[in-house]
Amino acid sequence: EAVRITRELMRIDTSNYGDGSGPTERPAAEYVVGELREVGIAATIIESKPGRASVVVRIAGGDRRRGGLVVHGHLDVVPANPADWSVDPFSAVERDGMIWGRGAVDMKSMDAMMLANLRRIAREAIIPPRDLVFAFFADEEQGGVLGADWLVSHHPALFDGCTEAISEVGGYSITLPVAGSNQTRRAYLLQTAEKGLVWVHLRATG
């Protein structure tokens, strides 16, 4: 199911150009809500601006005294120039056992896994040990101003009681040789820092 959802989400162009000219996240948000409603989960689209849509769903846990866990992804993607690709970046072609296209790694695949797990929770009437908040944000690729940042500022109650959060899978594993053998080992890198931004004004006299 996660593969199906990944491919269907990838075929929805949600390129974020940073200037408001993109197709917006609304179609992807509507897709998410449709997949949830199909299994009886009520979900609402929340817009920071017309078209800049996010979806947040809370699943009640068995012990409401425990801090809730936020599992979040983003629906927008970095723009893709078809001339730079060997496949249509929004076709979600399945080839060589992999799905090719924009969003396969960053991060519609995780969005799909979140959705698939939500659908399973609903179908099997699973009650998690603590509250789970699943969030599908807009605007991550341009700083989250119209997505996560806006929701936390304008709808903080959506995240009441949450104490941890996990997210971003915009990376990939690497294959490393095993010393003294012909074997290889797959390594999954762990991020220990986050990129930042600093403005520097330089003046040089020649």
Map each language-model feature to its residues:
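Acidic/His- and Gly-rich active-site-bordering loop/insert found
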Residues: 1-104, 123-130
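Acidic/histidine-rich catalytic neighborhood of metal-dependent amide-processing enzymes
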Residues: 105-192
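Polar, glycine-rich mid-to-C-terminal structural blocks
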Residues: 200, 205-206
